[in-house]
Amino acid sequence: TCVLLKNGQPVDGFMGAVPEGKLREFLDKHVPGENEVLAATDLQEAEALMESGDLETAQAKLLEALQANPENDDVRFDLVKLLISMGQLDDAETVIQPCLSQIPLKLRFEALKQWLNALHFVSTDPMGQWPLEKFDQLIATNKRDFDARFAKARVLLASDDWTGAMDELLEIIMRDKKWNDEAPRKTMVGLLELMTPVAPKGGTDHTGKSAGGIELMGKSAVQEDPQAAMVSSYRRKLSMMLN
C-alpha cells in the first residue's frame, strides 16, 4: 500500500504495484510543476517587496509569476490589487478581465471589480469631483436621492474612507434593497471581502491586515482584533437590512 501525505495528512494512495507510467501519473496529480513552483516563489518574493514598499519590483515579480502560470488566481489577485493601489486602473482592468468571465465569478474578483468601478467613476464622472458637502445638501433635501448617496459612497471609497462608504451604502440598502440592480449591496459585499482579515498561517492571531490589503485604524485598536470585529459588525448590519 502506498499513501501520499501532505502536511502530515493522507491525501491519496493506491494498492499494490503499479507501472512506472501510472506512478508518474499519480505523482503529477499532486506534485506542482516547474511553472507552479516558480510562480509560488515569485508570489512570496513579491509579497515581501510590497511589505517593504518596493512596489515597482513587486509588480515585475507578479507579472513574471503570472506569465509562468496564468491560471494562478492568487498571483492575479495580488497583481490587480497592486495595480489599483498604484493608480494603474487600465492595467488592472486588463489583468482582471480573464477572471470576470468565470462562472461562478469568485467573490474576491467581484470585490476587485466593485473597487475598480468606484475608482473609474470618481476619475471619469463629474460627480466624482464634487465636495462631500454638495452630496450632503442633496441628501438632506431628499433622503431617497440614491444617485447622490451612491456617488458619495464611491467618492468616500476612493479617498480610503471605507467605513464611511459602507455607512452610505447601508442607507440605500435600508430604503431600497433592489435599487440599481443591487449595486449598493454588491459593492458592500465586495468591500467586506477585501477588508476581511487574512487567515493566519500557523497561529490564531490576526495581523490586522485584510485579504485585500486594507488596514483600518481607529478607537477599536484597543480590542484584540479590531479589523475582524469591525468587519463582523458591518456584516451583521448588512444582514439585518437584507432580512
Give short role names for the model-derived ranges.
Residues 1-14:
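A short, hydrophobic beta-strand/beta-hairpin element that forms part of a small beta-sheet core
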Residues 38-68, 121, 126, 130-138, ...:
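Alpha-helical segment of the N-proximal tetratricopeptide repeat
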Residues 45, 79, 113, 152, ...:
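Structural register within alpha-helical repeat arrays
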Residues 62, 96-97, 135, 168-169, ...:
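Inward-facing hydrophobic residues that define packing positions of alpha-helical scaffold repeats
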Residues 70, 103-104, 142-144, 160, ...:
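Short coil turns that delineate tetratricopeptide repeat
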